[in-house]
Structures are given as C-alpha cells and as structure tokens.
Regions:
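Domain-edge interaction signal
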Residues: 2-203
C-alpha cells in the first residue's frame, strides 16, 4: 500500500486533516499532468480546477466512484480540489512543505498559471479515467475561465456555499451532492451512498 501521508490544509480559517496514500497522491498528480498536456503554454489554476471538477462529476455519474481521492471545496469562484489547491498555494510559501516536493517535481506556478514539464505516468490512468478526462478537456478547454466559473456554480456548490454561512468549516462538497448536480440517477446515488457508509464503517 505504501506510506500514508497526513495532510493538513488551512483555508479560510478552516482546518482539514486528510490521510492520503502514496498511490492516491501519485494518481492525483498523474491526472493533473494528463490535463496539462492539453495546455503546453500553461493553464489558469481556476480553469484547471473546474476541468477537474467536471471530470470528477462525470466519473461519479457514470461509475459511482471518484476519479481522484481529493475533496472539492466550495470557494467563492467555484469548486477547487483541496489537496491540489494547498500544494499550489505552498509554492508561494518559503520554504515549501517538504512533503509536497515530490508532487511539485516537474510542475511550476507563476502568478495564476500552472505549467508542467513532466509527463503523466499512464500506468495510473485507466480507460474510464481517460474517457472522462478527455470529455471534460474537450468540452471546457477553450471556455473562458470566468464563464467556466459560472458553469461550476451548480446545485452542489450552492448548497456548500449556503452551509458556510452557518459554519465556515462546512465548505466541502459531498460526492453525493456532486453526483446529484451531474444528474446521476437514483440507483447510482444509492450505490454511492452505500459505498460511503461501508467506507466510513471501515475507517
């Protein structure tokens, strides 16, 4: 299984603690690099986050599981993957957290754009991964970041933003809400819920 990393993210006065395995982190980076192949001149962080969100949503609707083990939080301008957001924010900090060094190898951030010199390890990308990623990239690659932000303000994002008014620590978007916003049918929602119940019971 490999080592498990304890990840603490402090965002908008909110602390989240995650335990991600080496394989999960590697998969997250691989998906990131896969998307960035379509942006040789770099991509705005906001656009990258939205493409990831829509790919995650499509994957949940089609297969009842997540594409990447990264929770999405409802930031002001749209959903953002929590772990990736924290890593990219760390680039601006001196020194960068040592635990992020491997993830950042081959990735650079300048102002609000991210660039990649590394290639994705396709051993971590399945056929179903590729289908959902390619669909999101094709559909949104040329969309203006501001328009893409508006498109990402779906019901799942709105519900999370509403929760923040009562409790700033509740800005994570649940995968069931993401699937519902993507119009997953009742059977798929029930399947996702059952998997979550089992996972929580085993954790």
């Amino acid at each position: 299984m490999g080592p498990v990393f304890r990840f603490i993210s402090t965002i908008a006065s909110t602390d989240y603690v995650y335990y991600l395995s080496f394989i999960q982190i590697t998969k997250i980076k691989t998906v990131l690099l896969y998307i960035m192949q379509s942006f040789p001149k770099g991509v705005e962080c906001a656009k990258l986050f939205r493409i990831l969100y829509f790919a995650q949503q499509d994957y949940l609707v089609k297969y009842g599981k997540v594409l990447i083990e990264d929770s999405f939080m409802a930031l002001k301008y749209g959903p953002a993957p929590t772990y990736i957001y924290r890593v990219l924010q760390a680039v601006k900090e001196k020194p960068t957290e040592e635990s992020f060094n491997d993830f950042l190898a081959g990735i650079e951030v300048h102002e609000q754009k991210i660039y990649a010199s590394a290639k994705p390890d396709m051993n971590y990308i399945s056929g179903s991964d590729k289908r959902c990623l390619d669909a999101a990239i094709t559909k949104y690659k040329d969309t203006d970041p501001y328009d893409l932000s508006d498109l990402s303000h779906d019901l799942a994002w709105k519900e999370a933003r509403a929760r923040i008014k009562d409790n700033p620590q509740k800005n994570l978007i649940t995968i069931i809400d993401i699937a519902r916003a993507g119009k997953a049918n009742k059977e798929m929602i029930d399947y996702i819920r059952e998997k979550q119940i089992v996972r929580n019971a085993l954790s």
